[in-house]
Swiss-Prot record:
<keyword id="KW-0648">Protein biosynthesis</keyword>
<keyword id="KW-0963">Cytoplasm</keyword>
<dbReference type="Pfam" id="PF05746">
    <property type="entry name" value="DALR_1"/>
</dbReference>
<comment type="subunit">
    <text>Tetramer of two alpha and two beta subunits.</text>
</comment>
<dbReference type="GO" id="GO:0005524">
    <property type="term" value="F:ATP binding"/>
</dbReference>
<keyword id="KW-0067">ATP-binding</keyword>
<dbReference type="InterPro" id="IPR006194">
    <property type="entry name" value="Gly-tRNA-synth_heterodimer"/>
</dbReference>
<keyword id="KW-0436">Ligase</keyword>
<dbReference type="GO" id="GO:0004820">
    <property type="term" value="F:glycine-tRNA ligase activity"/>
</dbReference>
<dbReference type="GO" id="GO:0006426">
    <property type="term" value="P:glycyl-tRNA aminoacylation"/>
</dbReference>
<dbReference type="InterPro" id="IPR015944">
    <property type="entry name" value="Gly-tRNA-synth_bsu"/>
</dbReference>
<dbReference type="Pfam" id="PF02092">
    <property type="entry name" value="tRNA_synt_2f"/>
</dbReference>
<keyword id="KW-0547">Nucleotide-binding</keyword>
<dbReference type="InterPro" id="IPR008909">
    <property type="entry name" value="DALR_anticod-bd"/>
</dbReference>
<dbReference type="GO" id="GO:0006420">
    <property type="term" value="P:arginyl-tRNA aminoacylation"/>
</dbReference>
<keyword id="KW-0030">Aminoacyl-tRNA synthetase</keyword>
<dbReference type="GO" id="GO:0004814">
    <property type="term" value="F:arginine-tRNA ligase activity"/>
</dbReference>
Length: 689
């Protein structure tokens, strides 16, 4: 069977840079699925992506599908014919679907009966006949939120398409893809190399495109070149480039032929907070900032051109001219904002709505101020500093700098607070109030910042849930999932003595009569416990371990963490599986029983040695573990409880729980309930699988 290389390249207008990788990866995944569905053997599917093209190369693709034997079992003979031996409607319908008549069907005989059988040898189709359709299907399933039309055609795609190249070996695969007939023509760089040329065979790609068209189609190669050359460029000026992964990805998606260049700006701009300068360079211009070895911003930046120029200095000068006005704006805003104190912006917060039913940002500030003070008192932070941070928390939103450079919120509050002489932990709290912003982000670094961050997030959670605007599906406009996880991470990882019940109640209380949802406290807590579940699953804890702990509905996050870790450790013990099974058995027995249990086990009613032994063991453990439970030492408690295994096994082997004697039965059920209560001090281990 002949094997060849297949190439498809879709030549387009500039594709969305932030979506380029996902488009290419999805194209490859979709086409791979099509190959598998079509039963076309292949070697490897390799994707390529550049600003004006998506391409796939499939190695060792079979020229035809493999022949296959098809078998379709029909109705049983008893249902296939009536009493007179005539085919039933079911048999005729089945035969028609197979393209035969009933009398052409074979018989399948097994020890379970006899059925009609269709058997055929299906010859594999040529790959040439299948590939165009498979490409169309793969493209139609790309994750494109908004499609566009172009020209006078009804065809829709993420961007206008100009060329479609499909080659199997050296042969053009005929077909129409996205309204374009396939050919062997590909286009090169807009300004370098050959603007258009033909491919002789699929194996030439992408090397010939790089040599003749001055386009590096290999996404990872472009990214590696940019990273390598930017690091070298920074070293030449004694610095280190800020090569964040997200910006590297975006820049690699913007250029077909990366050329790394170094530029500079006036040193006077370094008086402006570095965050504002970096925001301009990275966010607006897609430049890489450069720092010295001490982490201070240098008056240089590295950028990537999409062309090899005979006069690179001209490109450098052009970029320096572009960025200078933006830096000058930042300098002006910074100087202007500092002409008044941060606190002077408070009245302007009354003009900005937080949410229609929940009031203005000034209303939110007042609530945050009170809640931050309350949280600070609970965790031993400076209450005065926490309330001060709460009062100033949203003031920087009214500054010129944050209005123009929105991503600098928080950090500009810190700089302005320092300028005003505020306490350092207050200033830092203003910067860190939004942390953690994403999974893996840093947590607030001091107790005042923790109090402010928790207060800000809990106020939003209480308010939005309080008016019934819960997150639905993928829609979460107020980022409540992120807020909930942020609160939990701060409490757990900082080991703060906070209870979600009282914390939520306090956040709700501060809204007064604004909230309409009477179940807001319970709903916020359930939502946060749900985020706990997702977080700990991501951390590698099993679902049933988390469920076992959640069954106790622990509302202190640090306590939840300790319980989950204790149960996870317990599962490594030899006795764990047997005790989990025993707890499940106990749970089922108690659930089915209609007897009213005693308050305590009556020693006088105990008859069997095994139940006496269990009762004695439970009394000893209960007294021993009371201070252990109180201290939250759940792992130690479960290790002690694991010693019950032998005693519990003996009990179930030799004692009839559901005795005919009412007093004996109720006493034994009470004994089992006391056993279960001990384990429930940690978790419901009957839920462990």
């Amino acid at each position: 069977m002949t094997q060849q290389t297949f190439l498809v390249e879709i030549g387009t207008e500039e594709l969305p840079p932030k979506a380029l990788r996902s488009l290419a990866e999805s194209f490859a995944a979709n086409f791979t699925a099509e190959l598998n569905n079509a039963n076309l053997p292949y070697g490897e599917v390799i994707w390529y992506a550049a600003p004006r093209r998506l391409a796939l190369k499939v190695t060792n693709l079979s020229a035809t599908q493999a022949d296959r034997e098809v078998e379709k079992r029909g109705p049983a003979i008893a249902q296939a014919f009536d009493a007179e031996g005539k085919p039933s409607k079911a048999a005729e319908g089945w035969a028609r679907g197979c393209g035969i008549t009933v009398d052409q069907a074979e018989r399948l005989v097994t020890d379970k009966g006899e059925w009609l059988l269709y058997r055929a040898h299906v010859k594999g189709q040529s790959a040439q006949l299948l590939l165009a359709g498979m490409v169309n299907t793969a493209l139609s399933k790309l994750p494109i939120p908004k499609l566009m039309r172009w020209g006078d055609k009804d065809t829709q795609f993420v961007r206008p398409v100009h060329t479609v190249t499909m080659l199997l070996g050296s042969e053009v695969i005929p077909g129409t893809v996205l309204g374009i007939d396939s050919d062997r023509i590909i286009r090169g760089h807009r300004f370098m190399g050959e603007p258009e040329f033909t491919l002789d065979n699929a194996d030439q790609y992408p090397q010939v495109l790089q040599e003749r068209g001055k386009v590096i189609a290999d996404y990872e190669l472009r990214k590696a070149i940019i990273k390598r050359d930017a690091e070298l460029a920074a070293q030449k000026i004694g610095g280190v480039a800020d090569l964040s992964e997200s910006l590297l990805e975006e820049v690699a998606s913007l250029v077909e032929w990366p050329v790394v260049l170094t530029a500079k700006f006036e040193e006077k701009f370094l008086a402006v907070p570095a965050e504002a300068l970096v925001y301009t360079m990275k966010g607006d211009q897609k430049y890489f900032p450069v720092y010295d070895t001490a982490g201070n911003l240098l008056p240089n930046f590295i950028f990537v051109a999409n062309i090899e120029s005979k006069d690179p200095q001209q490109i450098i000068s052009g970029n320096e001219k572009v960025v200078r006005p933006r830096l000058a704006d930042a300098e002006f805003f910074f100087k202007t904002d500092r002409k008044k104190r941060l606190e002077d912006n408070l009245p302007r917060l009354e003009t900005v709505l937080f949410q229609q039913q929940l009031g203005t940002l000034r209303d939110k500030t007042d609530r945050i101020q009170a809640l931050a003070g309350w949280v600070a008192a609970q965790i031993g932070a400076d209450v005065n500093h926490a309330t001060r941070a709460g009062l100033l928390s949203k003031c920087d939103l009214m500054t010129n700098m944050v209005f123009e450079f929105t991503d600098t919120q928080g950090v500009m509050g810190m700089h302005y607070a320092r300028h005003d002489g505020e306490a350092e932990d207050v200033a830092v709290a203003l910067n860190e109030q939004y942390q953690p912003r994403f999974a893996g982000d840093d947590l607030p670094s001091n107790p005042v910042a923790c109090a402010l961050a928790i207060a800000d997030k809990m106020d939003t959670l209480a308010g939005i849930f309080g008016i019934g605007q819960h997150p639905k599906g993928d829609k979460d406009p107020f980022a409540l999932r992120r807020a909930a996880l942020g609160v939990l991470r701060i409490i757990v990882e900082k080991n703060l003595p906070l209870d979600l019940q009282t914390l939520t109640e306090e956040a709700v209380r501060l809204y007064g009569s604004k909230l309409t949802n009477t179940k807001v406290v319970d709903e916020v807590i359930e939502f946060m416990l749900g985020r706990f579940r997702a977080w700990y699953q991501d951390e590698g804890h099993s679902v049933d371990t988390i469920q076992a702990v959640l069954a106790r509905r622990p509302t202190r996050p640090a306590d939840f963490d300790a319980r989950v870790k204790a149960v996870t450790y317990f599962r490594t013990l030899d006795a764990a599986a047997a005790l989990a099974a025993a707890n499940k058995r106990v749970s089922n027995i108690l659930a089915k029983s209609t007897d009213k249990l005693n308050d305590h086990v009556r020693a006088s009613v105990l008859k069997e040695p095994a139940e006496l032994k269990l009762a004695t063991h439970l009394v000893v453990l209960r007294d021993k573990l009371e201070p252990v439970f109180a201290a939250g030492q759940y792992q130690e408690a479960l290790v002690e409880l694991a010693a019950l295994r032998e005693t519990v096994d003996e009990f179930f082997e030799s004692v009839m729980v559901m005795d005919e004697d009412d007093a004996v039965r109720v006493n034994r059920l009470t004994l089992l309930s006391k056993l279960r209560e001990l384990f429930l001090q940690v978790a419901d281990i009957s839920l462990l699988q």
